[in-house]
Amino acid sequence: MTEYTPMIKQYLEIKDKYQDAFLFFRLGDFYEMFFEDALNASQILEITLTGREGGTKEKIPMCGVPYHSASGYIDTLIEKGYKVAICEQVEDPKTTKGMVKREVVQLISPGTVMDERGLKAKENNYIASLYCYEGKEYGFAYSDLSTGELKSTVIEASEDRLINELTTLSTRELIVSASEKEVLSDVMKEQLGLTFSVHEEDTIPLENEKLVTRHMSLSEKRAIGKLLHYLKETQKRDLGHLQQAVHYETSNYMKMDYYSKRNLELAESIRGKGRQGTLLWLLDNTQTAMGGRMLKQWIDRPLIDRNKIIERQNDVSELMANFFERLELVENLKNVYDLERLAGRVAYGNVNARDLIQLRNSLYQIPRIRATLLSMNSKSLTELANQLDPCEELTEKLEEAIMDSAPISIREGGIIKDGYNSQLDTYRDASRNGKTWIAELERKERELTGIKTMKVGFNRVFGYYIEVTRANTHLLPEGRYERKQTLTNAERYITPELKEKEKLILDAEEKSMELEYQLFTEVRELVKDYIERLQKLAKSVSEIDCLQSFADISEKNHFIRPTLSEDGSLHVKQGRHPVVEKVMGAQSYVANDCDLDRNREILLITGPNMSGKSTYMRQVALTAICAQVGCFVPAEEATLPIFDQIFTRIGAADDLIAGQSTFMVEMLEARNAIVHATKDSLILFDEIGRGTATYDGMALAQAIIEYIHENVHAKTLFSTHYHELTDLEKELHGLQNIHVSAVEENGKVVFLHKIKEGPADKSYGIHVAELAELPKSLIERASRILEQLENDDKKIVITNDKQPEEIHEEVQLSMFPVEPEKKASSKETKLLKEIASMNIMQMTPMDAMNKLYELQSKIH
């Protein structure tokens, strides 16, 4: 049996409690890792792997990082989804006999990051917990430890519902019991980018009972308890900044599943996975970090409460009407610090003097923001202004205590203002007077000895000294100077007077720094008493910031205030896709109308590829979302219903994370919409059925349209390449054909991007293939096949009485190129098309002659 050294034994005992984390084990000035941790960390962090004697025949794998620069390495591990247990020496090695006691003082995980460098300013960092109650419902709680936010709800015990909540929040970590983790699918565990933490205890800690209200359900309380207990156990410190748990109902907001939000690119682009090109990117002109985080929350959860939507619209209208006041408001907001995260760092004891300066400067802005809002003489903005708490007593205390030029370090002095504490002033005077005496001593000694290069210096090892070059040492009087240090070209001395004064100066400086640190911690503790008020203030400032952002974006982009319809109708005149318009420029974008009501529930959209069908569909959805977050919308006029849900199946960026085919993903998304949609929902289906055989796809597309028409009655935009489906307009009274127009000019297709009534007459798919520069022989072959199909074309739409109007005869297409039938009309048409597509202006006379011979040979 291996007999490890005492230090390795201690390491292994602690590591056994934190098997799912990298253990940063403090040894002197380094955090060391051993065994498997060392092997893995050396690769991930790209640091040197070494070995250490530990009682085994071979050296134990070891790697380490300096403690003073460990935060960067920790951030790297956390970003990759790992956990880090910080193990510190909790005894002074100088006063301890034998092995120094060590303990884990904090477990840092993706959901518990507090260091600013590991957080994104305008993104929350959520950790969530789950409690499954009898397999019927999930208690669900989440928190952003950096801001103190704590919320909870109850959702259906469905993995889809759980995924929706987790992805809406961009959750970094999920706490579950071992049995709960067991039943979650591999998709949940491996593909959502979550760190799973197993924790069994779900009782609410006594000190946190005040955070939970009585009316919450058992499953909700257990989820909160699991979250709070985990945070208490891993953070090992006061979490007094956690706010009272707020219950929320998902039914109070517009519902959009993960796929819908992804397809609409609300907060993350499909291709770049960043904010660029998203609705959030467009609407975000917030000036504060906390305002940016609130804006994302608003976009993730649009309102369905008519009064709340109108309230936001009123505020945006008032801010737009007061241009100069809004500019002043923006300037004030620019100087407001991240109050939410500051409160969290205060609770953690991580705040420094510069944080307090920024807090003070932020509080200076509050009366100015309040005065600006009141000057607009708006009832709604006055209510917002009156919610702003300037925390005047705290502002005065910070002004009185903290120097404007305070350093980051809180243990080296220079933080507290003169006049704040009389004892500190006494120490400082002693130190300053002593340094004046030192300067005077240097002058006197030079005069006494005649050594003009003599100087008085200081270092931490020898204290104050008199330095004389070796060439001048013979000028020193004997008996008065005591040699302390010999250098290459100089000697250093002390005198009795210098030694006595040194003690007075150093004692004063040491006591000054000790007292200054004590005074700083007292001020920091005082700020703790204001945490709750600062959090409420942060929420009010964030709301004001979001509203001014809406006003600014609406004005710059010529958005208009939408009307909310009572009858469920949707009428948009000259609507635009807000993001595409921003990227392309307003002059290049083609605006379009959209009309839907109880008698016109489904728009069947046909038109060429690349013509803008998908953009048009997204445009309608984004207009609705803009309206329901309280912003104005990109249109000349707009009357919109309040949608309870939006379902989409748009684009080709299929998410095959579960190993499903494109067609299976299509059908699952279609099922989700059909099962959950109501008459107040919006459905966007783009090319449903494209993932299977033509007849299968067409049959399913028709059946889905009919089912929505007869049973769901949701507002629906359904694009298709199955032109045969346009005959459904005769069968379904609530369906209307529209198309995206295109024209042919000189044999080339020109997309007009304009929506018109009625079905499209052609697809122009082969023209799109030409634009993609497919081989010419392939294009010609496709044209011949198309001609064959068009010559044999019959309708295949099946009426609701299940009797076929006409059944398409099967066409066996040759696997090899075959010559088309010799039909004069067809040949003439082809020749005319070829002649029309010729670019005569770029032909040389010889090219033209050769082309003429080629055409003549085709005729013969």
Curated annotation (Swiss-Prot):
UniProt-annotated binding residues for ATP: 607-614
Gene3D superfamilies: 1.10.1420.10, DNA repair protein MutS, domain I, MutS, connector domain, P-loop containing nucleotide triphosphate hydrolases
InterPro entries reported for this sequence: DNA_mismatch_repair_MutS (IPR005748), DNA_mismatch_repair_MutS-lik_N (IPR007695), DNA_mismatch_repair_MutS/MSH (IPR017261), DNA_mismatch_repair_MutS_C (IPR000432), DNA_mismatch_repair_MutS_clamp (IPR007861), DNA_mismatch_repair_MutS_core (IPR007696), DNA_mismatch_repair_MutS_N (IPR016151), DNA_mismatch_repair_MutS_sf (IPR036187)
Entry keywords, A to Z: ATP-binding, DNA damage, DNA repair, DNA-binding, Nucleotide-binding
Record keyword DNA-binding present: yes
Protein name listed in UniProt: DNA mismatch repair protein MutS
Family: Belongs to the DNA mismatch repair MutS family.
Gene Ontology molecular function terms on file: ATP binding; ATP-dependent DNA damage sensor activity; damaged DNA binding; mismatched DNA binding
Disulfide pairings: none
CDD domains listed in its UniProt record: ABC_MutS1
Native species: Listeria monocytogenes serotype 4a (strain HCC23)
UniProt cross-references to Pfam families, sorted A to Z: MutS_I (PF01624), MutS_II (PF05188), MutS_III (PF05192), MutS_IV (PF05190), MutS_V (PF00488)
Encoding gene, per UniProt annotation: mutS
Domain of life of the source: Bacteria
Record function comment: This protein is involved in the repair of mismatches in DNA. It is possible that it carries out the mismatch recognition step. This protein has a weak ATPase activity.
BP GO annotations: mismatch repair
GO cellular component term, pick one: cytosol
